[in-house]
């Protein structure tokens, strides 16, 4: 019979199975190929997905530190090659693969990442964005590259040969390996912060796709696009084309070509200036000679020898114009006088004095009518006031007192109207027509109702 102690807990069984997985040397390093399923990119976090074929599926997890080393972006349905270890997740009891490395099945991981980024930036229009023109005669050129490679030597040699008056400033950078992309971005920012450079040359010599990879990083490409200073990219050999080459303002096949694009040939420019100076001198001399010839011709002309003949014909015209002007002025004054006289006659006919006199008559008549209306109104008001006074007099208390009546108040001047208001021996006051009588209540008798 099975004892209770023979039963395992779920935790104990799960831990036992997990130990089996982790101790199995065949499961400690597993190479899998399959199709990505249930993948949703989680920025700056662990990635959870499944790997499947046509018959089976296994859960997969890739920690953030391992996923940051993946050069391409995994996509749903993509076939990949995975290296990892198999273990069991105790909380769910599911076994899964912990992915340590992943790359596309078929294409190399770097090439896949290159194509993905190239398509992304092309969709954003970064490759077709307007390019900054290079400064024709640069004073200062910033070079971002390795301080020990052949690139900087070629650029220095070419620049000194072609345009020695330009100042080259090296911004040393790591151009391959981990951290190189961050250094390149930082150097681009430093050059732009200085603000006194005319051109930037960024690049390195040839190498494998892994060696050139920092120049295919998205952050480097965006730093080049954001640069306010024109950027010449010279990465790898002529057959190598990096993302940096595609977004730069100008791409150079070699470092020497980059220096040639950045600088003119000083001797050629001096020769051009000399030729332009000679052409300018010849043109100026020709113009001076032509003007001198024209001046001599004018000085010897018949007209200039007798200049009065130039304006003899105009003097007669001036006299005629003066006479016509005088006649026109006189006629204009005559017309204006006639107009003034006519206006004066009209004003006299419509003199304001007549209007004022008529207005005075109107005002006098209005005052007369107003006085009559006021007199009628006052008489009417006096009559109505007399009627009101007579009506008031009929109901006046004094009038009633005059007919022999009186009214009684107590010592507080309160009106006493009923028998109940009087008290025996209460002092009272009788108000009569011509004065006041003080009395005292002896007795009260209530009359019949």
Swiss-Prot record:
A cellular component annotation (GO) from this entry: cytoplasm
Keywords per UniProt: Cytoplasm, Exonuclease, Hydrolase, Nuclease
Top class in the EC scheme: hydrolase
Keyword Nuclease part of the UniProt annotation: yes
Domain of life: Bacteria
CDD domains: ExoVII_LU_OBF (cd04489)
Sections of the chain in a coiled coil: none
Subcellular location: Cytoplasm
One GO BP annotation of this record: DNA catabolic process
InterPro entries listed in its UniProt record: Exonuc_VII_L, Exonuc_VII_lsu_C, OB-fold_nuc-bd_dom
GO molecular function: exodeoxyribonuclease VII activity; nucleic acid binding
Entry keyword annotation includes Hydrolase: yes
Chief localization: cytoplasm
Reactions performed catalytically: Exonucleolytic cleavage in either 5'- to 3'- or 3'- to 5'-direction to yield nucleoside 5'-phosphates
Its job: Bidirectionally degrades single-stranded DNA into large acid-insoluble oligonucleotides, which are then degraded further into small acid-soluble oligonucleotides.
Protein family according to the UniProt entry: Belongs to the XseA family.
Subunit structure: Heterooligomer composed of large and small subunits.
PANTHER family the UniProt entry points to: EXODEOXYRIBONUCLEASE 7 LARGE SUBUNIT
Record protein name field: Exodeoxyribonuclease 7 large subunit
Organism: Latilactobacillus sakei subsp. sakei (strain 23K)
């Amino acid at each position: 019979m099975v004892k209770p102690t023979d039963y395992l807990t779920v935790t104990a069984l799960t831990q036992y199975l997990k130990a089996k997985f982790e101790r199995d040397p065949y499961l400690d390093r597993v190479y899998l190929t399959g199709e990505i399923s249930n993948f949703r990119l989680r920025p700056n976090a662990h990635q959870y997905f499944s790997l499947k074929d046509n018959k089976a599926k296994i859960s997969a997890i890739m920690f953030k530190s391992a996923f940051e080393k993946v050069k391409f972006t995994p996509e749903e349905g993509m076939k990949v090659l995975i290296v990892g270890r198999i273990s069991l997740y105790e909380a769910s009891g599911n076994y899964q693969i912990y992915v340590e490395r992943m790359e596309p099945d078929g294409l190399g991981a770097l090439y896949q990442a290159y194509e993905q980024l190239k398509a992304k930036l092309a969709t954003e229009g970064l490759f077709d964005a307007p390019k900054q023109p290079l400064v024709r005669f640069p004073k200062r050129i910033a070079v971002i590259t390795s301080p020990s490679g052949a690139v900087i030597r070629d650029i220095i040699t070419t620049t000194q040969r072609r345009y020695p008056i330009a100042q080259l400033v090296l911004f040393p950078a790591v151009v391959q390996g981990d951290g190189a992309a961050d250094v390149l971005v930082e150097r681009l920012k430093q050059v732009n912060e200085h603000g006194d450079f005319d051109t930037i040359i960024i690049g390195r010599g040839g190498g494998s796709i892994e060696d050139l990879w920092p120049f295919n990083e998205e952050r480097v490409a965006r730093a080049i696009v954001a640069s306010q200073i024109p950027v010449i990219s010279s990465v790898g050999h002529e057959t190598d084309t990096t993302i940096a080459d595609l977004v730069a303002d100008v791409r150079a096949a070699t470092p020497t070509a980059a220096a040639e694009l950045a600088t003119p040939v000083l001797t050629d420019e001096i020769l051009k200036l000399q030729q332009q100076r000679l052409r300018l001198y010849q043109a100026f001399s020709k113009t001076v000679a032509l003007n001198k010839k024209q001046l001599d011709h004018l000085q010897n002309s018949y007209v200039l020898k007798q200049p009065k003949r130039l304006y003899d014909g105009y003097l007669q015209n001036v006299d005629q114009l003066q006479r016509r002007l005088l006649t026109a002025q006189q006629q204009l004054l005559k017309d204006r006088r006639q107009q003034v006289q006519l206006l004066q006659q009209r004003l006299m006919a419509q003199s304001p004095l007549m209007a004022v006199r008529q207005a005075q008559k109107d005002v006098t008549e209005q005052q007369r009518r107003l006085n009559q209306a006021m007199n009628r109104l006052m008489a009417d008001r006096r009559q109505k006031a007399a009627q009101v006074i007579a009506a008031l007099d009929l109901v006046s208390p004094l009038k009633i007192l005059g007919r022999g009546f009186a009214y009684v108040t107590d010592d507080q001047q309160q009106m006493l109207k009923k028998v109940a208001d009087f008290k025996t021996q209460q002092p009272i006051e009788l108000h009569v027509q011509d004065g006041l009588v003080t009395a005292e209540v002896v007795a009260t008798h209530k009359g019949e109702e």
